[in-house]
Amino acid sequence: VKLWGVLVAAAERAYSTDLNRARRDLWKQLVWKVEKRERRDITLDEAKSISTFVNNSSGRIGSKGAMGTVAVGLNQVLWSTQLQLSRIRMLTGSSMWTASPAARRLIAGQYIRMLGSIGAIIGVGLLLGGDWEEDPRSGAIGKLRFGRLRLDVFAGIPQYIALAVRVIYGEQKTQQGAIIPTRGDVPFNQRGVASILGHFLWSKLAPIPGGTISAFAGENVIGQPFTPWDMLR
Protein backbone atom coordinates (compact mmCIF):
# COMPACT_ATOMS: atom_id res chain seq x y z
CA VAL A 1 0.00 0.00 0.00
CA LYS A 2 2.86 2.36 0.85
CA LEU A 3 4.55 1.66 -2.49
CA TRP A 4 1.27 2.32 -4.31
CA GLY A 5 0.94 5.67 -2.54
CA VAL A 6 4.47 6.61 -3.57
CA LEU A 7 3.75 5.70 -7.21
CA VAL A 8 0.51 7.70 -7.25
CA ALA A 9 2.25 10.75 -5.77
CA ALA A 10 5.06 10.46 -8.33
CA ALA A 11 2.58 10.19 -11.20
CA GLU A 12 0.71 13.25 -9.93
CA ARG A 13 3.94 15.27 -9.74
CA ALA A 14 4.93 14.17 -13.24
CA TYR A 15 1.54 15.16 -14.64
CA SER A 16 1.61 18.56 -12.93
CA THR A 17 5.16 19.19 -14.12
CA ASP A 18 4.37 18.36 -17.75
CA LEU A 19 1.18 20.43 -17.70
CA ASN A 20 2.96 23.43 -16.19
CA ARG A 21 5.69 23.09 -18.80
CA ALA A 22 3.05 23.10 -21.54
CA ARG A 23 1.46 26.21 -20.00
CA ARG A 24 4.83 27.95 -19.90
CA ASP A 25 5.62 27.08 -23.51
CA LEU A 26 2.22 28.31 -24.73
CA TRP A 27 2.57 31.54 -22.73
CA LYS A 28 6.02 32.22 -24.20
CA GLN A 29 4.72 31.56 -27.71
CA LEU A 30 1.77 33.94 -27.30
CA VAL A 31 3.97 36.65 -25.77
CA TRP A 32 6.34 36.33 -28.72
CA LYS A 33 3.41 36.76 -31.12
CA VAL A 34 2.28 39.97 -29.45
CA GLU A 35 5.78 41.43 -29.43
CA LYS A 36 6.33 40.51 -33.06
CA ARG A 37 2.96 41.91 -34.17
CA GLU A 38 3.17 45.12 -32.12
CA ARG A 39 6.95 45.57 -32.57
CA ARG A 40 7.48 46.39 -28.92
CA ASP A 41 8.01 44.70 -25.58
CA ILE A 42 4.91 43.30 -23.96
CA THR A 43 3.52 45.12 -20.92
CA LEU A 44 3.00 43.54 -17.51
CA ASP A 45 -0.80 43.79 -17.82
CA GLU A 46 -0.71 42.11 -21.23
CA ALA A 47 1.47 39.33 -19.85
CA LYS A 48 -1.05 38.80 -17.03
CA SER A 49 -3.99 38.71 -19.48
CA ILE A 50 -2.23 36.09 -21.58
CA SER A 51 -1.34 34.13 -18.45
CA THR A 52 -4.99 34.18 -17.38
CA PHE A 53 -6.08 32.84 -20.76
CA VAL A 54 -3.44 30.08 -20.73
CA ASN A 55 -4.46 29.01 -17.23
CA ASN A 56 -8.18 29.07 -18.03
CA SER A 57 -7.75 27.10 -21.25
CA SER A 58 -5.83 24.39 -19.38
CA GLY A 59 -8.21 24.04 -16.45
CA ARG A 60 -6.88 26.53 -13.89
CA ILE A 61 -7.79 29.97 -12.62
CA GLY A 62 -4.71 30.50 -10.46
CA SER A 63 -4.35 30.26 -6.69
CA LYS A 64 -3.92 33.98 -5.99
CA GLY A 65 -6.66 36.49 -5.27
CA ALA A 66 -10.09 36.00 -3.72
CA MET A 67 -11.31 33.60 -6.42
CA GLY A 68 -8.25 31.39 -6.08
CA THR A 69 -8.60 31.26 -2.30
CA VAL A 70 -12.27 30.30 -2.58
CA ALA A 71 -11.44 27.62 -5.16
CA VAL A 72 -8.84 26.03 -2.88
CA GLY A 73 -11.29 25.97 0.02
CA LEU A 74 -14.11 24.49 -2.06
CA ASN A 75 -11.92 21.57 -3.18
CA GLN A 76 -13.02 19.76 -0.02
CA VAL A 77 -16.61 19.88 -1.24
CA LEU A 78 -16.51 20.18 -5.03
CA TRP A 79 -14.50 18.10 -7.46
CA SER A 80 -11.74 20.13 -9.15
CA THR A 81 -13.14 23.58 -8.42
CA GLN A 82 -10.42 25.22 -10.49
CA LEU A 83 -11.44 23.19 -13.55
CA GLN A 84 -15.13 24.03 -13.15
CA LEU A 85 -14.49 27.76 -12.73
CA SER A 86 -12.07 27.75 -15.67
CA ARG A 87 -14.80 26.27 -17.92
CA ILE A 88 -17.11 29.14 -16.98
CA ARG A 89 -14.36 31.66 -17.63
CA MET A 90 -13.60 30.15 -21.02
CA LEU A 91 -17.30 30.29 -21.89
CA THR A 92 -17.58 33.96 -20.94
CA GLY A 93 -14.21 35.00 -22.37
CA SER A 94 -13.33 36.75 -19.12
CA SER A 95 -9.61 36.88 -19.95
CA MET A 96 -10.43 39.47 -22.63
CA TRP A 97 -12.57 41.76 -20.48
CA THR A 98 -9.75 43.93 -19.13
CA ALA A 99 -7.06 43.04 -21.67
CA SER A 100 -5.39 45.60 -23.90
CA PRO A 101 -6.45 45.72 -27.57
CA ALA A 102 -3.30 43.82 -28.56
CA ALA A 103 -3.84 41.06 -26.00
CA ARG A 104 -7.56 40.94 -26.78
CA ARG A 105 -6.89 40.39 -30.48
CA LEU A 106 -4.43 37.62 -29.66
CA ILE A 107 -6.80 35.82 -27.29
CA ALA A 108 -9.71 36.19 -29.72
CA GLY A 109 -7.51 34.62 -32.38
CA GLN A 110 -6.84 31.68 -30.08
CA TYR A 111 -10.58 31.21 -29.57
CA ILE A 112 -11.05 31.18 -33.34
CA ARG A 113 -8.27 28.61 -33.75
CA MET A 114 -9.76 26.38 -31.07
CA LEU A 115 -13.22 26.58 -32.62
CA GLY A 116 -11.73 25.79 -36.01
CA SER A 117 -9.96 22.72 -34.64
CA ILE A 118 -13.10 21.55 -32.84
CA GLY A 119 -15.12 22.13 -36.01
CA ALA A 120 -12.67 19.95 -37.94
CA ILE A 121 -13.01 17.17 -35.35
CA ILE A 122 -16.80 17.39 -35.54
CA GLY A 123 -16.65 17.31 -39.34
CA VAL A 124 -14.51 14.18 -39.33
CA GLY A 125 -16.82 12.61 -36.77
CA LEU A 126 -19.86 13.27 -38.94
CA LEU A 127 -18.09 11.79 -41.95
CA LEU A 128 -17.40 8.67 -39.90
CA GLY A 129 -21.09 8.26 -39.17
CA GLY A 130 -21.38 10.07 -35.86
CA ASP A 131 -24.08 12.50 -34.74
CA TRP A 132 -23.53 15.92 -33.20
CA GLU A 133 -25.98 17.37 -30.69
CA GLU A 134 -26.61 21.07 -31.31
CA ASP A 135 -29.77 21.61 -29.25
CA PRO A 136 -28.83 23.61 -26.11
CA ARG A 137 -31.75 22.04 -24.24
CA SER A 138 -29.99 18.67 -24.35
CA GLY A 139 -27.46 17.54 -21.76
CA ALA A 140 -25.40 16.17 -24.65
CA ILE A 141 -25.04 19.56 -26.36
CA GLY A 142 -21.78 19.85 -28.25
CA LYS A 143 -20.97 16.15 -27.98
CA LEU A 144 -20.26 13.72 -30.79
CA ARG A 145 -22.27 10.50 -30.58
CA PHE A 146 -21.23 7.11 -31.93
CA GLY A 147 -23.90 4.72 -30.70
CA ARG A 148 -23.60 4.75 -26.91
CA LEU A 149 -20.23 6.51 -27.02
CA ARG A 150 -20.11 10.26 -26.31
CA LEU A 151 -17.13 12.50 -27.09
CA ASP A 152 -17.06 15.86 -25.32
CA VAL A 153 -15.04 17.84 -27.88
CA PHE A 154 -15.70 21.14 -26.06
CA ALA A 155 -14.05 19.94 -22.82
CA GLY A 156 -17.07 20.33 -20.57
CA ILE A 157 -17.97 23.92 -21.46
CA PRO A 158 -21.43 23.32 -23.07
CA GLN A 159 -22.85 21.72 -19.91
CA TYR A 160 -23.21 25.19 -18.39
CA ILE A 161 -25.09 26.37 -21.49
CA ALA A 162 -27.49 23.44 -21.16
CA LEU A 163 -28.02 24.16 -17.46
CA ALA A 164 -28.77 27.84 -18.09
CA VAL A 165 -31.15 27.09 -20.97
CA ARG A 166 -33.06 24.46 -18.98
CA VAL A 167 -33.44 26.76 -15.99
CA ILE A 168 -34.14 30.05 -17.80
CA TYR A 169 -35.94 28.87 -20.94
CA GLY A 170 -37.90 26.17 -19.10
CA GLU A 171 -37.47 23.26 -21.52
CA GLN A 172 -35.19 20.28 -21.85
CA LYS A 173 -34.52 17.61 -24.43
CA THR A 174 -34.51 14.02 -23.21
CA GLN A 175 -32.19 11.27 -24.43
CA GLN A 176 -35.09 10.00 -26.53
CA GLY A 177 -35.37 13.39 -28.28
CA ALA A 178 -38.61 14.55 -26.62
CA ILE A 179 -38.94 18.20 -25.61
CA ILE A 180 -40.49 18.53 -22.15
CA PRO A 181 -41.01 21.46 -19.74
CA THR A 182 -38.85 21.99 -16.66
CA ARG A 183 -41.39 24.30 -15.00
CA GLY A 184 -45.12 24.02 -14.44
CA ASP A 185 -46.59 20.72 -15.67
CA VAL A 186 -43.42 18.60 -15.54
CA PRO A 187 -44.06 15.00 -16.71
CA PHE A 188 -43.89 12.22 -14.14
CA ASN A 189 -40.40 10.86 -13.47
CA GLN A 190 -38.75 13.86 -15.15
CA ARG A 191 -36.71 16.60 -13.51
CA GLY A 192 -37.98 20.10 -12.86
CA VAL A 193 -35.77 23.15 -12.32
CA ALA A 194 -35.03 22.41 -8.65
CA SER A 195 -34.17 18.79 -9.41
CA ILE A 196 -31.99 19.82 -12.37
CA LEU A 197 -30.00 22.25 -10.22
CA GLY A 198 -29.65 19.69 -7.42
CA HIS A 199 -28.54 16.94 -9.78
CA PHE A 200 -26.01 19.25 -11.46
CA LEU A 201 -24.51 20.17 -8.09
CA TRP A 202 -24.44 16.49 -7.10
CA SER A 203 -22.45 15.69 -10.25
CA LYS A 204 -19.82 18.29 -9.25
CA LEU A 205 -19.24 17.10 -5.68
CA ALA A 206 -15.93 15.71 -4.50
CA PRO A 207 -15.75 11.90 -4.01
CA ILE A 208 -16.48 11.85 -0.26
CA PRO A 209 -19.54 14.15 -0.15
CA GLY A 210 -20.76 12.81 -3.49
CA GLY A 211 -20.33 9.21 -2.35
CA THR A 212 -22.13 9.95 0.91
CA ILE A 213 -25.16 11.30 -0.94
CA SER A 214 -25.08 8.32 -3.31
CA ALA A 215 -24.98 5.91 -0.36
CA PHE A 216 -28.06 7.51 1.21
CA ALA A 217 -29.85 7.70 -2.16
CA GLY A 218 -29.06 4.08 -3.04
CA GLU A 219 -27.77 5.10 -6.46
CA ASN A 220 -24.99 7.22 -7.89
CA VAL A 221 -25.36 10.40 -9.92
CA ILE A 222 -25.94 8.46 -13.17
CA GLY A 223 -28.57 6.17 -11.66
CA GLN A 224 -26.48 3.05 -11.01
CA PRO A 225 -27.06 1.11 -7.75
CA PHE A 226 -24.77 2.32 -4.96
CA THR A 227 -24.28 1.12 -1.38
CA PRO A 228 -22.09 2.32 1.50
CA TRP A 229 -19.71 -0.55 0.73
CA ASP A 230 -19.07 0.95 -2.71
CA MET A 231 -17.37 3.92 -1.02
CA LEU A 232 -14.67 1.56 0.27
CA ARG A 233 -13.74 0.22 -3.13
Predicted regions and their residues:
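Amphipathic interfacial helices
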Residues: 1-233
